[in-house]
From Swiss-Prot:
PANTHER family: P450, PUTATIVE (EUROFUNG)-RELATED, P450, PUTATIVE (EUROFUNG)-RELATED-RELATED. GO terms for molecular function: heme binding; iron ion binding; monooxygenase activity; oxidoreductase activity, acting on paired donors, with incorporation or reduction of molecular oxygen. It comes from the Eukaryota. It is found in: Membrane. Gene3D superfamilies: Cytochrome P450. The chain crosses the membrane at residues 4-24. Its main location: membrane. Its cofactor is heme. This is Fumitremorgin C synthase. GO terms for biological process: verruculogen biosynthetic process. It catalyses: tryprostatin A + reduced [NADPH--hemoprotein reductase] + O2 = fumitremorgin C + oxidized [NADPH--hemoprotein reductase] + 2 H2O + H(+). Pfam families: p450.
Amino acid sequence: MERLPLSPAVLFLIIVLPILYLWIRYTAPARPHGKHLSLPPGPPRLPKIGNLHQVPRQIPWKKYKEWSDTYGPIMSVQLADTIAVVFSSWDLIKNHIERRNTIYSSRPSVPFFLHATGGLNASILPYGPEWKLQRAIRSSVLKPSMTVKYRDVQHVETTQLLHELLSTNDFPVCLRRCIASVFLTVAYGERCVDHAGLEAIDRLEELNRAIALHAEALFSGAAGILTQLVLPKALVDRLPVRWKKDADMLHNRLTADLVARTRAALVRPGWNWVKEFSMKDGIGSGDGDGEQGSKVELKRLAYMVGSLYEASMAASQALRVIILAGLLHPDATRRMHDELDAVVGTGRLPDFHDAAQLPYTQAFIKEAMRWRSLTPMGSPRATSDEDECRGYHIPCGATVLVNVWAINHDEAIFLDPFAFQPERWIENPDLPQLMYGMGQRACPGRHMGQDSLFLATARLFWAFDMALPDGADPIDQERFLDSGTTLAAFLPDFEVRFTPRSEKYQEVIENSMAVLPDVLSISATP
C-alpha cells in the first residue's frame, strides 16, 4: 500500500515540538514540585551538559567570581545532571550555611571516587550514621587535648627538617618527609627517618592523585562532559575511558597498601591510631583470614586511618606557600626575623611555648593561607534536604561550592585584598579563616595542622635566610597565584637557597639534632 506524504503540520509536530520541549526543559530555571521559588540565578545553559562547557578546568574560581558579580553572591550552574549552588559571600556562609549545618554537611556523589575508595573514605561519605561514627572516632585522637601530646613528635621532625636543610636545598622533599613522618608516627607507630622512606608514601600519593584527577571531571571540562552525560549504564561501561576498570585497579592497589600498613601497626609495639581505632565500638580489627566480616572490618579500619593521610599532607603544601610568600615579600620576612630574634634569641630553637609572644609570625601564616589558598573552591558539599536562601530554592542533593578565593579577596572584608599584609590579622583577629573549612565538615585534623604549621614556620624563618639560587629565573607571581583546579591548587615547583642566618643558628640546629629523644617511645603513651 502506498504511503501518503507527511504534511508540514505533522512534520512540525514530530520534529520541532520535541526540540522546543528539550530546550525549555534544560534551559529554563528549574522549579521544585509544588513550590513557587526558582533556583538561584546563573548563566544560560545548554541541553544535557548545562554549563559544564563554560567552567574552565584551571582557576575556575575566577569564572565563578565573574558570574557572581553578575548574578549575585548566591548563584547556580548546571553541571550535566547536577545542580551546583555557588556561595561567594562570607555573610551567607556565616549566617546561612553555618546555621543550617545538618543540611549542608553531606558530599556530592562522584561515582569514580566512590568506586575507587570502596565508599570507605570518610572525606567523601554522605552525611549519615557511618560518617557520624567515623567523625566521632577520628575526633577522639584529633581533639585539642590529644594533639598537644603529639608536639614532641613535631619537635623531633621539625628539628630534623632544619638539619637536612643545612646540607640540601631540596626543600619540597624535606617538607614531605617531615610532615609524613609526623603522621606515620602517630597513625602507625613508624617514622619516615630518611628520604628513602618516601617511596611508599609516593605510591600512596600517586594513587590519591589519580583518584582526584578522575573525580575532577564532575566539575569542569570536556572530560566532565563525556563522563557526566546521562547515558544507559551498559553504554557507560563501554566508553573508551573505561572508568570502572581504572577505578577497580586504583581501588585494589590503594586497599593493598593501606591494609598492609594497618596490619603492621596492629602488632607494632606502643600506641598508635590504628590500635586506638580498633578498640572503638563499631570498628573491628579482623586479620582478614577468617570470614568475610573480618575482611570488611580490617579494610574499613585501614581506610579510616589512611584517609587522614591526604589531609595531613596539606601542611607540606601550605609550608611551600609560606616559603614562597617569604621570598616575594622580604619586608614581611625581616619583620618576622626581628620578632623571632627578640623572643627566642640565638641560643635555642623556637618552641610551642613561644606562640603567644609571636603574633606577627602567626599572622604571617594566616595571611599566606589567605593570599594563596590551597582550596580556592573549598571542599564540595551536598545538601541532604531542600532549603531556601534569600528567596531562592536550593534542592535536596544539590552540590554546594564555596568560592573561598572570592571571599579571601572581598574588599569589604580585606582592605587591599591583593596585597600581602600580615598585620591585618593583628589589627582584626576576627577576620574569616577558611583554610580548614567550616562547620561539621571542617578538617578534623586542623588543631594538629595548625601546630605543625606554626612550629615549622617559626623554626624555618628563625634559622635560615631564603633566596633564589644564583642564576635562577625571577618568580612569576601571577603563574604561582593562578594555578589549580576545583579540587586543589598546588603550587608549581620553585627553587630556594637556604643559608643559616649565622654560625650560632647552625650550631643550635646541630646540637638539637644530637639530643633528639626517641619519638616512638613518646607516642606510646599519648
